[in-house]
From Swiss-Prot:
The keyword Nucleotidyltransferase does not apply. It comes from Musca domestica (House fly). One of its GO terms (cellular component) is nucleus. The gene is Kr. Krueppel is a gap class segmentation protein. InterPro entries: Znf_C2H2_sf, Znf_C2H2_type. It is found in: Nucleus. Transmembrane segments: none annotated. GO terms for biological process: segmentation. Keywords: Developmental protein, DNA-binding, Gap protein, Metal-binding, Nucleus, Repeat, Zinc, Zinc-finger. Belongs to the krueppel C2H2-type zinc-finger protein family. One of its GO terms (molecular function) is zinc ion binding. This is Protein krueppel. A zinc finger (C2H2-type) spans 1-4, 10-32, 38-60, 66-74.
Length: 74
């Protein structure tokens, strides 16, 4: 497993950053190309990674999943 060997065979041709997985390189390349394939259905925002879209959607749903340990506020 590459995780423990430190092997990073996938290199970005633009900035030479290296990755352990080809799909990590593919996602990284979007930073250079400007591709943002994930679109918010509520507004005009677009995102490189689906996780960022999911986090953004909380703006529209009002979901606040994290609680403050000091005041119990969200």
């Amino acid at each position: 497993e590459r995780t423990h060997t430190g092997e990073k065979p996938f290199e970005c041709p633009e900035c030479h950053k290296r990755f352990t997985r080809d799909h990590h390189l593919k996602t990284h390349m979007r930073l250079h190309t400007g591709e943002k394939p994930y679109h918010c259905s509520h507004c005009d925002r677009q995102f490189v990674q689906v996780a960022n879209l999911r986090r953004h959607l909380r703006v529209h749903t009002g979901e606040k999943p994290y609680t403050c340990e000091i005041c119990d506020g969200k």
